[in-house]
């Protein structure tokens, strides 16, 4: 029977019960087990629990150290950007065979009257590799020899929020850690003055919101931290009036001591996270404003990214005040973060959900993204950072070759959700550039060659960072969880 103050009870967590109920060599053995599972941190200076973001070694030699994931929320049309389909010109206005659509669940398309829709875009070849890309992406086209374009990604999720969860966390349900959280859990962070995982947003916001960068059941130290590119980088980071640095330091030291005592009793990793977050916030009061201060960047660099660009008119879903400048600035900040040791940077833009007005709105979004994304790749390469920085462009799914016909429209001006085949591209970080991997059928309905499920993409990403995806696990509620769930196969064709 357990007695005493319930607040101090050794039964307050399963870990504390296991740790305190053992004795002698049993305690040492248990501590070793917890350490192996990542549930018990090594001691830091002065006997304090080590930071959960302390650097750690992967399973084998990594090719990548950092990742910048550009997430175009809403699902860009791969047929109008990355995957040319001349057959759609021939079949424009004709229905697909019923055998291809009878068991398909659409978000909005009415099956009985749905017909194929051509792309008005011109595709041209770029680089020595001859990669075909849309005329909406001339700047990215200039990076073709550094890019691996995958045209055969697929998923089972056809609605935005589940699809975004699938791409960002490996499963289509709430409560699981995101890719950036898994990498910081596995590797720790090389930055002492900035978070290991930073999120930058532009546009109207993704439907998945913060669930896309959550730490899930991992300790909260591994969650993404939302930064703002202008003004106060993180809300409420500054001291309130009247709180000087000496009093602040004394308060933090007192909190650290109290939390360390509690950690010694419970071994709760959330207490480690709390100690680390307080100390990091203190250091970021100086480092975060310095990060977003671009006055030390040359004019040529600012112009390359387009940080002073003016928005185009007719924005549609992807617009917002100063969206061109904001997205460009976010790409530049991502490079500055990688230089400062940030492990994982997410850049979100929304929305690319073009159910209608595809021509106008895709032109707007692509023009916004094309220049700064290409500048990011080129800038990283010029500075010697691309070799160990993985850059990813992706989204939750693609768009249908069928035009969207809801509402009785006489003309189709958009495309519906399409998880059966879509495109992503990667550069740097051990990726073999200048290649196209995968192939879809003649109308872009199914991936038919080198098919790559999202779990396979995640397995490949972890491999580039030195991890066997089946061994990077975290025990939660009696089960070992991993980013790739119960699947995943490394796509070796992508790796140099």
State what each model feature region is.
Residues 1-496:
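Ligand-binding pockets and gating/stacking loops
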């Amino acid at each position: 029977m357990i007695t005493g103050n319930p607040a101090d009870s050794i039964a307050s967590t399963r870990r504390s019960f296991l740790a305190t109920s053992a004795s002698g060599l049993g305690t040492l053995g248990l501590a070793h087990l917890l350490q192996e599972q990542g549930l018990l941190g090594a001691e830091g200076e002065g006997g304090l629990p080590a930071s959960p973001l302390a650097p750690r070694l992967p399973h084998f030699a990594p090719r990548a150290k950092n990742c910048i994931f550009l997430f175009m929320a809403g699902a860009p049309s791969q047929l109008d950007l990355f995957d040319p389909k001349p057959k759609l010109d021939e079949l424009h206005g004709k229905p697909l065979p019923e055998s291809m659509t009878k068991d398909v669940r659409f978000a909005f398309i009415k099956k009985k009257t749905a017909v194929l829709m051509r792309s008005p875009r011109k595709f041209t070849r770029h680089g020595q590799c001859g990669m075909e890309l849309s005329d909406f992406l001339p700047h990215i086209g200039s990076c073709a020899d550094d890019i691996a374009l995958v045209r055969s990604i697929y998923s089972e999720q056809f609605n935005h929020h589940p699809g975004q969860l699938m791409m960002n966390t490996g499963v289509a349900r709430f409560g699981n850690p995101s890719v950036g959280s898994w990498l910081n859990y596995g590797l720790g962070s090389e930055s002492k003055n900035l978070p290991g995982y930073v999120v930058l947003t532009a546009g109207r916001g993704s439907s998945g919101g913060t669930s896309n960068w959550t730490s899930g059941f991992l300790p909260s130290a591994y969650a993404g931290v939302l930064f703002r590119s202008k003004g106060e980088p993180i809300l409420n980071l500054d001291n309130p009036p009247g709180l000087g640095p000496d009093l602040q330091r004394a308060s933090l030291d007192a909190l650290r001591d109290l939390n360390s005592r509690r950690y010694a009793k419970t071994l709760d990793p959330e207490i480690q996270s709390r100690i680390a977050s307080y100390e990091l916030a203190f250091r970021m009061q100086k480092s975060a404003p310095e990060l977003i201060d671009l006055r030390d960047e040359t004019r040529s660099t600012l112009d390359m990214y387009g940080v002073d660009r003016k928005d185009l008119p007719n924005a549609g879903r992807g617009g917002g005040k100063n969206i061109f400048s904001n997205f460009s600035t976010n790409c530049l900040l991502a490079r500055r973060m990688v230089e400062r040791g940030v492990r994982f940077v997410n850049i979100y833009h929304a929305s690319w959900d073009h159910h209608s007005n595809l021509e106008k709105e895709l032109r707007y979004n692509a023009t916004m993204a094309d220049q700064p994304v290409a500048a990011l790749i080129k800038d990283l390469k010029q500075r010697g950072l691309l070799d160990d920085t993985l850059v990813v462009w992706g989204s939750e799914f693609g768009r249908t070759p069928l035009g969207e016909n809801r509402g009785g429209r006489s003309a189709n001006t958009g495309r519906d959700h399409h998880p059966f085949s879509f495109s992503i591209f990667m550069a740097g970080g051990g990726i073999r550039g200048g290649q196209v991997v995968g192939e879809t059928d003649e109308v872009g309905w199914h991936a038919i060659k080198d098919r790559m499920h999202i779990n396979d993409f995640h397995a490949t990403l972890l491999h580039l960072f030195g991890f066997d995806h089946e061994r990077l696990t975290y025990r939660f509620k009696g089960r070992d969880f991993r980013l790739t769930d119960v699947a995943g196969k490394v796509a070796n064709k992508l790796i140099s």
